[in-house]
A protein has these predicted regions:
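Papain-like cysteine protease catalytic cores
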Residues: 1-66
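Exposed substrate/partner-binding surface patches
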Residues: 26, 30-34, 58-312
Length: 312
């Protein structure tokens, strides 16, 4: 993971901001490619760029994260037909998210300023007037001191995952949480893109729950260009340059039954070398019409992992 901080920014779509993000993304990606050259990395590894803009000081924390599986939240269904499009899920993944309160940002810069302000406002022990019998010497301890300089703004980045995890630990009471805007985009797309639909979340009592909303899965020409960092237009008027980031589906993994990933049954639909789609259900294998299967309630409500390959 690579962590970087942009000193000031007027927003998340300014030319300075986008240009700096592209530089950070390229440095991290070229370093990864120069030190990792395997078939798995060449085919399945991509890069995600996570940005957090502090609303108080307008500094941007940037972190990069390599991925083999891209976790994507499930969007709200369309009111008319109750279906969810995969494109809507990807758009929700890439949208700017407002965060505050307990989910706010531990901004290194803001906390450093607060620490310096506290220290400057603290009375000098050498000149404090104290009652007789309670004389302060240079060796007397000073209460209330704390060192926040080791906290990094980049440490706030959490890996996205569909697997239920424990709630985020609350920061020390001496730290200040600031409101922020968060956005995640894709720095580099892999040749083989694996999308994980985030169907599982932690419920009351740490029990996981499964979201069975029906997701419409494109078979061909899934356009990923809208979610790639170097395609973001600083003016907000669309793509800054043409892109050819289309993907075709070659496999789908379903999770059936349980509300937990630890249990349940997995079924896979895959396109084989003969260009025929098959359903793999334990020891049972049968040829299927994938265009029909993708319209069924079984597939739409239980699709968990989607396997796409770049279209050439």
């Amino acid at each position: 993971m690579f962590v970087f901080q942009i000193e000031t920014s007027d927003g998340m779509n300014t030319p300075q901001y986008i240009g700096s993000l592209n530089t950070v993304s390229e440095i991290d990606w070229y370093h990864h490619c120069s030190t990792n050259s395997t078939a798995v990395n060449d085919l399945f590894t991509g890069q995600m760029v996570d940005m957090r803009l502090c609303d108080a000081c307008l500094r941007v924390a940037v972190s990069t994260q390599l991925f083999h599986i891209l976790p994507v939240p499930i969007a709200e269904p369309y009111p008319l037909h109750g279906l969810v499009s995969l494109e809507a899920c990807l758009a929700q993944f890439a949208q700017i998210e407002l965060m505050g309160g307990a989910n706010g940002l531990v901004c290194d810069h803001c906390n450093r300023l607060r620490l310096l302000s506290d220290r400057s406002s603290r009375p000098d022990p050498a000149v404090v007037v104290t009652p007789i019998g309670n004389h302060i010497t240079p060796l007397s301890p000073i209460s209330g001191g704390s060192d926040l300089m080791n906290d990094s703004i980049g440490r706030e980045t959490q890996q996205r995952t569909s697997t239920p995890i424990q709630s985020r630990p609350q920061p020390s009471t001496s730290l200040v949480l600031t409101d922020c805007r968060r956005r995640s985009l894709i720095g580099y797309l892999p040749s083989c893109l694996v999308i994980q639909l985030m169907r599982f979340s932690a419920g009351p009592g740490r029990q996981s729950t499964k979201l069975c909303l029906p997701v419409v899965i494109p078979l061909n020409r899934l356009d990923m260009s809208l979610y790639v960092l170097h395609n973001v237009d600083p003016a907000g008027a669309g793509l800054s340059e043409p892109s050819e980031d289309f993907y075709n589906l070659y496999a789908v993994c379903l999770h059936l039954g349980s509300d937990s990933t630890n249990n349940g049954h997995y079924v896979t639909y895959a396109r084989c070398a003969d260009d025929v789609w098959y359903c793999f259900d334990d020891d049972q294998v049968r040829a299927v019409n994938i265009e029909y299967e993708l319209t069924t309630r079984l597939v739409r409500q239980n699709a968990y992992l989607l396997f796409y390959e770049r279209a050439f």
